[in-house]
């Protein structure tokens, strides 16, 4: 009888690493007989779950995501009064992901903390204050504009300064660095005054807006922070409105192995294409689960693979995955048909009929299922 160690060694060469680690963990406390039965059972299930050659996984994935997507639209209209079923959280976000939009409509970061900062609300709040961008507008109690004299006067809120852990010297140091053409900025006590050398109504309004946006502390781009408690893992984490993943990951209190942004392009630039692939699948799954829809994660990963296999994030569409197909007929079948065919003709492209779409258009055997079989004559 084969030993447990030999079987696990052979199993590690067959199973994917994450699945193998789960099996290894599960058999650790079992006797040899039960361990072998479990391993054989897992191996049988794994082998029978593999896709057969020629399986039309693309259309299965499209149906598996598209049909629940239709339900999501219907539910969104039906439950229009409920925030959790609103269109803004469902279909629009799904479109943002598959279109790989450059800027999401609601950029967010999920900032996870290292112990002990994640074990108490006070410790997590101290990190949140460190992350949130604080501008003069945040600290302002009162803003007065004198259009005749050409001055902007800002009165600071003492309670806000105390809450943010800032002093007048901190603010004064930042304000002293602020410079502008034909503008003089001074600070006396809790009052900041900006004066134009030559009064100008239009210019003074622009000066007011710029001064209020001067960053005093925090990370640029992070407009709001909200503390969240995860009861399952007994920890506090931070959700931010606005993202700056690279800057946040440099904080020693932040756990870089779990912190992420919902901005696909930012994740690609900071963490790489593999992290982007995982995020695409995770975001699609999260959007569907929020609507109470259960879809196998492997369908999401197939979409993610199609968007990232080239090493760069590409949208699903004529400017990305579909537009990069070798077949001119497949490209033409998606959008802008006439233009695509004319351009393909000018370049003298060949149609090899290797894909599904172009084969259907031409009435040829589709290269899926039994269509991939080619019989050879034996002489």
Curated annotation (Swiss-Prot):
One of its GO terms (biological process) is DNA-templated transcription. The keyword 4Fe-4S does not apply. It is found in: Cytoplasm. One of its GO terms (molecular function) is DNA binding. Keywords: Cytoplasm, DNA-binding, DNA-directed RNA polymerase, Nucleotidyltransferase, Transcription, Transferase. The keyword Nucleotidyltransferase applies. Its EC number is 2.7.7.6. Gene3D superfamilies: 1.10.150.390. DNA-dependent RNA polymerase (RNAP) catalyzes the transcription of DNA into RNA using the four ribonucleoside triphosphates as substrates. Forms part of the jaw domain. HAMAP family: RNApol_arch_Rpo1C. Part of the RNA polymerase complex. This is DNA-directed RNA polymerase subunit Rpo1C. It comes from Pyrobaculum aerophilum (strain ATCC 51768 / DSM 7523 / JCM 9630 / CIP 104966 / NBRC 100827 / IM2).
């Amino acid at each position: 009888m084969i030993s447990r160690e030999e079987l696990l060694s052979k199993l590690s060469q067959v199973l994917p690493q994450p699945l193998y680690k789960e099996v290894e963990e599960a058999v650790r406390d079992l006797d040899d007989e039960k361990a072998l039965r479990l391993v054989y059972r897992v191996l049988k299930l794994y082998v029978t779950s593999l896709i057969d050659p020629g399986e039309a996984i693309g259309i299965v994935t499209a149906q598996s995501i598209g049909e629940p997507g239709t339900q999501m639209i219907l539910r969104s209209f039906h439950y229009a009064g409920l925030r959790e079923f609103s269109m803004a959280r469902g279909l629009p976000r799904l479109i943002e992901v598959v279109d790989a939009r450059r800027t999401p409509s609601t950029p967010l970061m999920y900032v996870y903390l290292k112990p002990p900062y994640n074990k108490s609300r006070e410790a997590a709040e101290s990190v949140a204050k460190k992350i949130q961008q604080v501008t003069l507008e945040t600290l302002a109690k009162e803003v007065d504009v004198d259009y005749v004299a050409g001055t902007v006067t800002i009165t600071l809120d003492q309670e806000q300064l105390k809450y943010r852990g800032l002093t007048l010297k901190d603010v004064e140091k930042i304000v002293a660095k602020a410079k502008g053409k034909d503008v003089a900025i001074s600070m006396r006590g809790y009052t900041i005054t900006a004066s134009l050398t030559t009064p100008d109504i239009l210019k003074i309004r622009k000066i007011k807006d710029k001064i209020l946006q001067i960053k005093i502390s925090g990370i640029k781009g992070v407009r709001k922070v909200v503390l969240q408690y995860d009861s399952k893992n007994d920890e506090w984490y931070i959700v931010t409105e606005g993202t700056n993943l690279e800057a946040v990951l440099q904080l020693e209190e932040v756990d870089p192995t779990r912190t992420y942004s919902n901005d696909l392009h930012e994740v690609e630039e900071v963490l790489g294409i593999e992290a982007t692939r995982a995020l695409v699948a995770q975001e699609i799954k999260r959007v569907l689960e929020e609507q109470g829809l259960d879809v196998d994660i492997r369908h999401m990963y197939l979409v993610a693979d199609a968007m990232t296999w080239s090493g760069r994030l590409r949208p699903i569409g004529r400017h990305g995955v579909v537009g990069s197909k070798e077949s001119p007929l497949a490209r033409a079948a998606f959008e802008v048909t006439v233009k695509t065919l004319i351009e393909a003709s000018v370049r003298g492209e060949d149609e090899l009929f290797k894909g599904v779409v172009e084969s259907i258009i031409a009435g040829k055997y589709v290269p899926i299922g039994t269509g991939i079989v080619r019989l050879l004559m034996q002489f």
